[in-house]
A protein has these predicted regions:
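Short, acidic, Ser/Thr-enriched surface-loop or helix-capping motifs
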Residues: 50
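Conserved active-site beta-strand-loop modules that form the wall/rim of enzyme catalytic pockets
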Residues: 45-46, 88
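Short loop/turn microsegments at loop-to-beta-strand junctions
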Residues: 43-45, 124
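Short loop/turn motifs at secondary-structure junctions and domain boundaries
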Residues: 37-40
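Active-site-proximal loop/helix of nucleotide/amide-processing enzymes and allied scaffolds
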Residues: 30, 62, 66-151
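Accessory alpha-helical DNA-binding modules that contact the DNA backbone or grooves
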Residues: 1-32, 136-148
């Protein structure tokens, strides 16, 4: 019965958000804040978007420890390809409450960004949720320039 309740909740949430789109990082942070800010472990979510930046689906890619989560470009882009995503946004939490990106956050983001360039699926942002605050890596200047070596 517990599984049926969870399945029902997931179906109703999915049905309640057709063509859901976000205008800026603050609207994304607000959408995920309550889901993530009280978690005791890092959770990485991938938002998959269509060509008009409407949310196709979001999925939890990883549940980690109190200060780390393991994620690889392979896992990210398998999900993106499954939903025919044109672009994606990563969202994860820092259980300690401070949303400032760590060096590891920057390195993982760069690997995922570069893999997306090769696949033609853009990583638009990586948003980190803390306690009642969030950081957009793009807005804070922790973003990347496209590679010059294309083709």
């Amino acid at each position: 019965l517990k599984c049926i309740g969870e399945l029902s909740k997931r179906i109703s949430c999915a049905a309640a958000r057709p063509n859901l789109s976000f205008q800026n990082p603050d609207s994304i942070a607000a959408y995920y804040m309550e889901q993530l800010r009280h978690q005791e472990q890092e959770i990485m979510i991938c938002m998959m978007l269509d060509n008009q930046n409407h949310l196709l689906n979001d999925t939890i890619l990883s549940k980690g420890t109190v200060n780390a989560t393991l994620i690889t470009p392979r896992e990210v882009y398998l999900e993106a390809l499954r939903y025919h995503a044109v672009s994606l946004i990563l969202v994860h939490n820092h259980p300690g409450g401070n949303p400032v990106p760590s060096q590891c956050d920057r390195e993982v983001t760069e690997r995922i960004f570069r893999a997306g360039e090769m696949l033609g699926i853009g990583l638009l942002d990586h948003i980190i949720i803390g306690d009642r605050q969030a950081v957009s890596m793009r807005e804070q200047g922790f973003w990347l320039e496209p590679s010059k070596n294309k083709g």
